[in-house]
């Protein structure tokens, strides 16, 4: 215990942190290394050291000595804390502004400097009794603010600023010129029309299936769980490729229609039709999950009251249930609208001549003519549309209350749906199940064929090309990279999500709503825009981290941060605050309270967030497609390259492997989470 106390007191010493930064300045590069620590030459390493010559980086560390001199001024505790905060702000601003002006990319020692300044700011705020002087909470809050600023706010601002620059020249008129082009106007209108259509149809299908699982199904309700898992584990491009195998030029449905009905338009799929079909297949489950939860929260006693007043089933549904679902319906439409706007993979496979914003941004960056100005302008437009929708959803729908559950214990039974609606839903679900069965069957079968539409001979060549060339060739490097990056990103996502949730739910401070809003903003920023903004923000001074695995991990963490936060917020809402207060009253620190009280009780929710974050990190493409290199390529980028080269069989085979792997991971974690819950029999014995 004494050794632990001594270690803790060491970390709570400002002298320790200042000394650590000075040691880092001597031992680590203060300027960025183009080829990293392991591959840089001795001369490159020496040139990057801050002490190797008189340079700007010395001035970033020199003011730290001021913290050793402050006690000699014998200021009051409050005054000294304010002076320290002023000095910390000066060092941070001076370092980043000077690095930007003089094009100096920051090195590893600056990371230690930022950590030191965060620790010193924590001590200063503790002296001012912020958060009751709880250093752990203050430090966690400051770390989260820095994380959000550097990797959400800063890149978002960077993409807006860059659209007014033509290279190094300030050219605001180019925005009007780019947006005034007829082609760009058509791309924007295509995207908005497609997203609106997909949003409406996906919400209709989602409502139908939610009504089936909550009002019709008895033994077949498990279909809802399968329905909600499939889109999560399906990698990008795979749904689009599966639709192509069925309905494309050489698809078996197209050939059947041609043979028996004389259907000759074999290109009908490529364009709006194909993108809409693929997106509805991918996003209707999102609507289902939203509306399924909303329907389960409607108290059956309301329906019984309607029948008691002699209303028939049609009147009850359209006048009672449907109005209560309006917030969820609007929420579903807006979320699917954003997802459709941001979708990159399906338009790339099925778009044909129907161009949308997300793919056009990709072509501006990865195409033959590099055009950052047009990419950032279109990215800004896409971001503006997404942010407007997100703000409407967050501020309007989020603040509306349609409470139907009171404190009374009577539950009642849900009533039957109108017969016409019931049979319509059953027909819709039957069609959907058959279509999805054929779709995924085509995907798995297609991965074993020589050439779909030409030669259906079964073969293992596609899998041999992927995994039969050794660990250093084929798909192995991308799969290993993906597992490593996702394995690092998922725990960080859950950890930061827990910290943010604990601070937002359990602590009161100015700016709490802003912090929560900015964290949820990660969901609103389309993946393509996030990728472009990271290139613009981190491809030059002051922070140069493009081309590294670090930026990919950061992108994965920031994209999925709301998942961990929302899971922890939901769990904390079920834990009485008196548990925390009891721990703190026994002189337990906030860190011990979180680790020994909160974390064990939130384990099921956090494990679910962990596996969801892991799977999303495994399947992300639009946010990282611009960030990967030959050395950091991930699975989805490998699939994208195969699609671009026309190697559909190899791409489908890789997608099939990922589906199986991720389904196994989800089922494994579902089994673990099931074991972490207390069985009812044990709970009764404990009582």
Swiss-Prot record:
PROSITE patterns: ABC_TM1. Belongs to the binding-protein-dependent transport system permease family. FbpB subfamily. GO terms for biological process: iron ion transport; transmembrane transport. Pfam families: BPD_transp_1 (PF00528). Keywords: Cell inner membrane, Cell membrane, Ion transport, Iron, Iron transport, Membrane, Repeat, Transmembrane, Transmembrane helix, Transport. InterPro entries: MetI-like, MetI-like_sf. The chain crosses the membrane at residues 10-30, 50-70, 85-105, 106-126, 141-161, 192-212, 226-246, 271-291, 318-338, 347-367, 378-398, 425-445, 450-472, 484-504, 517-537, 538-558, 594-614, 620-640, 649-669. The gene is fbpB. GO terms for cellular component: plasma membrane. It is found in: Cell inner membrane. Its main location: membrane. It is a multi-pass membrane protein. Part of the ABC transporter complex FbpABC (TC 3.A.1.10.1) involved in Fe(3+) ions import. Probably responsible for the translocation of the substrate across the membrane. The complex is composed of two ATP-binding proteins (FbpC), two transmembrane proteins (FbpB) and a solute-binding protein (FbpA). Signal peptide: none annotated. This is Ferric transport system permease protein FbpB. Residues 188-393, 479-669 form the ABC transmembrane type-1 domain.
